[in-house]
């Protein structure tokens, strides 16, 4: 079983090559599709040079709209969603994120990056993570609703759908992977405005009570995951138990008369 990779990118020519390098030749990757969301910095050309298929959008419509266009073009059974600006991504990170889903231990997986906000790292989950493995069928089912979402409402909308379906989710640590802050990419004030717009979109998409419920649900998923790991470690196979061969009786000697 292999993955289709979907990446929405807007003006990521500087960082996209590192992401594509981690995917090149990966045995679990069947196809890489980059949706160029109206970039003006040569992102599409960089994607082609990195071996990806490219779907070019003439106007920047935001991440949700770009992903909706990409989902319509995919055909595989499972999809790996990746942000275009990741740094430090390695092939083994891709393998570890895919493993719980491909082994059918979970219905979906999401990453916890090394530079995720401190609160998310303390909780052990980033509910806004853009790096996920999940069934294409779920994304296709949700696709008709995506055009009505805010530009940055995709992740929390997806969380709600997975929670409603009772999906089991695995959280995979990516300590060496980072996603730069918007202020680092766009400058301080533009970055702060972009962060504020993202928060506004998230709250427009899902109310605060639902967001808290999503975090609690994912925390419960982590507890289930940890319990399963502990139970697995506690099982000792009969083939690995130490030998318990009984000690033969020692001969006795009669005392001399």
State where each predicted segment sits.
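Conserved donor-nucleotide/metal-binding helix-loop-beta segment in metal-dependent transferases, i.e.
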Residues: 91-112
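Cell-envelope/extracellular polymer assembly enzymes that use nucleotide-activated donors
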Residues: 2-4, 157
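Short, well-formed alpha-helical segments that are part of the catalytic scaffolds
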Residues: 11-25
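Hydrophobic helical membrane-anchoring modules
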Residues: 149, 161-257
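Short beta-strand-to-loop element that shapes/binds the nucleotide-sugar donor at the catalytic cleft/hinge
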Residues: 109-122
């Amino acid at each position: 079983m292999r993955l289709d990779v979907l990446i929405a990118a807007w003006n990521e020519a500087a960082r996209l090559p590192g992401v594509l390098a981690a995917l090149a030749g990966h045995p679990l990757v069947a196809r890489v599709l980059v949706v160029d969301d109206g970039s003006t910095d040569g992102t599409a050309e960089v994607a082609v040079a990195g071996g990806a298929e490219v779907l070019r959008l003439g106007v920047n419509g935001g991440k949700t709209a770009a992903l909706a266009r990409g989902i319509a073009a995919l055909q595989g059974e499972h999809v790996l969603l990746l942000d275009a600006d990741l740094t430090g991504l390695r092939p083994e990170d891709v393998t570890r994120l895919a493993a719980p889903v491909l082994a059918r231990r979970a219905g979906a997986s999401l990453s916890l990056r090394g530079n995720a906000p401190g609160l998310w790292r303390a909780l052990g989950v980033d509910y806004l993570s853009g790096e996920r493995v999940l069934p294409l069928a779920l994304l296709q089912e949700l696709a008709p609703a995506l055009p009505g979402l805010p530009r940055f409402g995709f992740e929390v909308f997806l969380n709600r759908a997975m929670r409603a379906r009772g999906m089991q989710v695995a959280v995979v640590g990516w300590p060496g992977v980072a996603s730069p802050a918007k202020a680092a990419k766009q400058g301080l004030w533009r970055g702060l405005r972009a962060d504020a717009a993202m928060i506004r979109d998230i709250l427009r998409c899902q109310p605060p009570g639902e967001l808290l419920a999503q975090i609690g649900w994912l925390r419960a998923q982590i507890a289930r995951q940890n319990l399963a790991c502990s139970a697995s470690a506690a099982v000792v196979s009969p083939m690995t138990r130490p030998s318990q061969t009984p000690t033969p009786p020692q001969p006795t000697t009669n005392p001399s008369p």
